[in-house]
UniProtKB/Swiss-Prot annotation:
EC number(s) given by UniProt: 1.5.1.5, 3.5.4.9
Signal sequence region: none
SUBUNIT field: Homodimer.
Name of the protein described by the UniProt record: Bifunctional protein FolD
Pfam families reported for this sequence: THF_DHG_CYH (PF00763), THF_DHG_CYH_C (PF02882)
Length: 283
């Protein structure tokens, strides 16, 4: 018997129904949320991501604010765009689409975002608030993963979760979310320096793979019945490929498809962060 699919698309659609109602209420109060994007250059992947985000906005009634800039802009020109969105009352929250061209400092650009308008939940101030247990925008992908597990009744409280990958967008904040009292999981954070990774993953009730190494998590690394969340993105022969091998579906209890698992929820919680930011102004 194969694993249950952690279907992110259906779950995203449920979130969109809720968001559409909340946005309508905000609009009735004269406070329609606005999501901004800053896109530098013409990377096809980045363009596709930004198009998708604005298509999502249209579905739930959020206003779109786009700032598309040429690849050869200076740091000063990028800073001017960020400052303009920081001051723009129609922009509730926004993102700077990564990666930026190599002559631009990504960290400096992200730090320049007003933390109150940080739609991704990755500003150093907001990550610091997460560490302290204070209210702040949450990182979209980790938040989406927790929601997906809860949606399919995967037990989190008391579970041993092995996170593979220590990146800023998933690996590091994932542990912060899962060890909050509201989740109460025990987290082991693994990476390229981890010795005997399979020995750790075989103990896990939940595995979250976020390294971008195609099919690195195989069936022999998974405890029967465990939940496996695939966040990795690679291209193999031109096709998007995740970190989880196909044979894992025969051993695990739950597996997120990739694509179609976590990705839709990352986008859904980007919009959720913006809606919550606008709602907080009315509170």
């Amino acid at each position: 018997m194969g694993a249950i699919s952690l279907d992110g698309k259906t779950t995203r659609d449920e979130i969109f129904v809720d968001l559409k109602e909340r946005v309508a209420a905000l609009t009735a109060a004269g406070r329609t949320p606005g999501l901004g994007t800053v896109l530098v250059g013409d990377d096809p992947g980045s363009q596709a991501y930004v198009r998708g985000k604005h298509a999502d906005c249209a579905k739930v009634g959020i206003n779109s604010i786009r700032r598309d800039l040429p690849a050869d802009i200076t740091t000063e020109q990028l800073n001017e765009t960020i400052d303009e969105l920081n001051a723009n009352p129609d922009c509730t929250g926004y993102i700077v689409q990564l990666p930026l061209p190599k002559h631009l400092d990504e960290n400096a650009a992200l730090e320049r975002i007003d933390p109150a308008k940080d739609a991704d939940g990755l500003h150093p101030t907001n990550l610091g608030r997460l560490v302290l247990g204070k209210q702040a925008a949450l990182p979209c992908t980790p938040r989406g993963i927790v929601h997906l597990l809860r949606r399919f009744d995967v037990p989190i409280a008391g579970a041993h979760v092995v996170v593979i990958g220590r990146g800023v967008t998933v690996g590091r904040p994932m542990g912060l979310l899962l060890t909050r009292r509201s989740e109460n999981a025990t987290v082991t954070l693994c990476h390229t320096g981890t010795r005997d990774l399979p020995a750790l993953t075989r103990q896990a009730d939940i595995i979250i793979a976020a390294v971008g190494v195609p099919h690195m998590v195989t069936a022999d690394m998974v405890k029967p019945g465990a939940a496996v969340v695939d966040v990795g993105v690679s291209r193999v022969d031109g096709k998007l490929t995740g970190d989880v091998a196909p044979d894992v579906w025969e051993v695990a209890g739950h597996v997120s498809p990739n694509p179609g698992g976590v990705g839709p929820l990352t986008r859904a919680f980007l919009l959720t962060n913006v809606v919550e930011a606008e709602e907080s102004k009315l509170a």
